[in-house]
Curated annotation (Swiss-Prot):
Species of provenance: Arabidopsis thaliana (Mouse-ear cress)
Subcellular location: Plastid, Chloroplast membrane
Reported function: May play a role in leaf development.
Protein name as it appears in the record: Protein RETICULATA-RELATED 4, chloroplastic
Superkingdom of the organism of origin: Eukaryota
Protein family membership: Belongs to the RETICULATA family.
Effect of loss of the gene: Pale interveinal phenotype due to marked reduction in the density of mesophyll cells in interveinal regions of leaves.
Amino acid sequence: MAIASCFFCVPTPNTAISESNLTWPHIASFPRLSSSSSFNGVISAKSISFNRRVPITPVLSASSGNGGSDNNGGGLSGGGGGGDGGKNDGDGHGDEDRDRNRNEAMLLLKESGIELESLPKDLAAAIEAGRIPGSVITRFLELQKSAVMRWLMQFGGFRERLLADDLFMAKLAMECGVGIFTKTAAEYERRRENFFNELEVVFADVAMAIIADFMLVYLPAPTVSLRPPLALTAGGISKFFHNCPDNAFQVALSGTSYTLLQRLGAITRNGAKLFAVGTTSSLVGTAITNAFIKARKAVDQNSEGEVETVPIVSTSVAYGVYMAVSSNLRYQIVAGVIEQRLLEPMLHQHKLALSALCFAVRTGNTFLGSLLWVDYARLIGIQKSH
């Protein structure tokens, strides 16, 4: 039911920007927004107070075609636009949402003494286009206080993910940490007394597993899309996938919405990427393992028949398919449904508890994935059961 609700929900008019039901005065459209734009005579920075701390939670609308709003954990919310990935729905709600987003963002920047021109170009353009609500600006200002986060925010991919989830780096560390431990334990179980004699192969296998784990967290993570529109000459397929979310189940920001087809497109696009990642990482890891096995057999004739080489191509393609289907769906559900839609709204003010639950969920997902891989590999015949 929770997954189904990510695709189908009844839109409701968005009449409030917070639980205090503040009414925003209508502000004339800005011909060109910048830090020097004057708000005198229209609205003052003190007319609406942002001194109250805004909870850093996903904002938004979970519509799949029409405008609508989801109030997740008290964050700023708003109706989605139309079903064309950021377009309005034709009844004026999309334009109102973007005007409100623009006004919120500009007021917060003015109160913080930050000029629009000093922001990353993609973020500044998104603010001017009204695609960034005030809660995202609040999160941006919070992240800027950390030197590490400020450095990571220089990179577009990390910037989009950190603005959507301030615990993204913690989840990435959890996943890679669990991956290192479980993969090393599996290597030791398989090699036993030869573990330290085969450290080169162990290192290669673990490194490939970490790369795969990184991409499994990075690609399906919910994002705040800062991508500029494609050129008018771009093909229809390119435009379609460009407008798809990074996570099929992610909550849409105020002023944006995704159709059911676009959400399905997110699964397809990420599946293609994970197939390439899984196949490549398995090719490298399997090739290194086989090379070491053959070298050991050439030196030690007594080792003949002890360890069989692994079929490179079939194993790599099988692993790519496994990541594109099983891993893709599991990690999309973990990030978009369990974490963003269920855990964050309940625990957005209790970061430690939220992190602990995310760790438990991701550890369980990793264990489940290991079991599914063994069953799948035996089913298609690339591994034998003894």
